[in-house]
């Protein structure tokens, strides 16, 4: 059984026992989080009806908070000597799917 959930502006296909890296979610490691905007559930049959999906939630547990890979940004203007360097690491949360109900 799997489900497609939406969190942090992205969609993820998850099944029970999966580890998923998502945009940062507030909470301590070990805390439970329910991902409610479920878009699709596939069990005995595929369900996409909004009225049936309103009662479905994906239960997860926060494993850890981490950061994504470093992204390097460079602005450069020709002939003026203007250079600007910047970097960014996106904060992420690792979730373990404990159940789909």
From Swiss-Prot:
**UniProt keyword terms in alphabetical order:** Ribonucleoprotein, Ribosomal protein, RNA-binding, rRNA-binding
- Give GO terms: molecular function aspect only: rRNA binding; structural constituent of ribosome
GO (cellular component) term, any one = cytoplasm
GO terms for biological process, alphabetical: translation
PANTHER family in the cross-refs: 50S RIBOSOMAL PROTEIN L21, LARGE RIBOSOMAL SUBUNIT PROTEIN BL21M
Q: What does this protein do?
A: This protein binds to 23S rRNA in the presence of protein L20.
**Which HAMAP family does UniProt cross-reference here?**
Ribosomal_bL21 (MF_01363)
Sequence similarity: Belongs to the bacterial ribosomal protein bL21 family.
Record note on quaternary structure: Part of the 50S ribosomal subunit. Contacts protein L20.
Q: What is this protein called?
A: Large ribosomal subunit protein bL21
In its UniProt entry, the species of origin is given as Corynebacterium glutamicum (strain ATCC 13032 / DSM 20300 / JCM 1318 / BCRC 11384 / CCUG 27702 / LMG 3730 / NBRC 12168 / NCIMB 10025 / NRRL B-2784 / 534)
């Amino acid at each position: 059984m799997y489900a497609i959930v939406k969190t942090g502006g992205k969609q993820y296909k998850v099944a029970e026992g999966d580890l998923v890296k998502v945009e940062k979610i507030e909470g301590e490691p070990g805390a439970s989080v329910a991902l409610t905007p479920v878009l699709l559930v596939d069990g005995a049959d595929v369900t996409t009806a909004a009225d049936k999906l309103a009662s479905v939630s994906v239960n997860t547990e926060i494993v850890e908070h981490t950061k994504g890979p470093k992204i390097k940004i460079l602005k450069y203007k020709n002939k003026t000597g203007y250079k600007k360097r910047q970097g960014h690491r996106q904060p992420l949360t690792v979730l373990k799917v404990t159940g789909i109900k």
